Amino acid sequence: SDSLSFSFINFDQDERNVIAQGDARLSGNNILQLTRTDSDGTPVRSTVGRILYSAQVRLWEKSTNRVANFQTQFSFFLESPLSNPADGIAFFIAPPDTAIPSGSAGGLLGLFSPKTAQNESANQVLAVEFDTFYAQNSNTWDPNYPHIGIDVNSIKSAKTVRWERREGVTLNVLVTYNPSTKTLDVVATYPDGQRYDLSVVVDVTTVLPEWVRVGFSAASGEQFQTHNLESWSFTSTLLYTAQKE
């Protein structure tokens, strides 16, 4: 179909439209926990979890030169007993058969293989990451502070903005893609109005196949935190764009 729209006000136990990968699971309180916790709810080391929406999304259509105009809204919060919690959560778009790469725990956020994490020609993923861990000795590709980043086929973000991780506080995020300007815009806000903006110009037809899946990924390495998705809505519609030169 030319358009797709869905909305989760929260996540109940019987969520048939979600494909869970790795350690992701629905917790009893209508929250989707992307990374593993022990029996008393404390986050653990070396965990990766992802979820995908079951239906595929038509991102573009070569035969008609149409490209999707899409918008997604989601909210999440992070919790950890540590002073330097890790690693982060990302909204991502990838080919429909996408799976967790081997060795992608920790700073690779469940999205990239260690061998090809910065080799753009080896990847097909567009992601918006919320990265809380930035040790320069290990995550050499990161800026030296917590950040929001837009990743285009690489763990080294195309654009980043400094971000404040707030323990247990919900961050609301809006991501939009405009195919006529080829702009991906991210706006993230905390309840008190603190706001973060970033955008990048990206032609999705050069990054991803015509059909994709959309979802979330999160990971922890030696340091840890919970990655809790509270709500998620997504809508996309194919639009005619100007003929390519």
Swiss-Prot record:
Annotated binding of Ca(2+), by residue: D131, F133, N139, D142
Temperature dependence: Thermostable. Retains hemagglutinating activity after incubation at 70 degrees Celsius for 1 hour. At higher temperatures activity drops drastically and is lost at 100 degrees Celsius.
Highest taxon listed in the record's lineage: Eukaryota
The entry's keywords: Calcium, Glycoprotein, Lectin, Manganese, Mannose-binding, Metal-binding, Toxin
KW Metal-binding (keyword) present: yes
Miscellaneous comment text of the record: Hemagglutinating activity is not inhibited by D-arabinose, D-fructose, D-fucose, D-galactose, D-xylose, alpha-methyl-D-glactopyranoside, carrageenan, lactose or mucin.
Family indicated by similarity: Belongs to the leguminous lectin family.
Record's function text: Mannose/glucose-specific lectin that also binds derivatives N-acetyl-D-glucosamine and alpha-methyl-D-mannopyranoside with even higher affinity. Has hemagglutinating activity towards rabbit erythrocytes. Is toxic towards brine shrimp A.nauplii. In rats, induces dose-dependent paw edema.
Protein name: Mannose/glucose-specific lectin
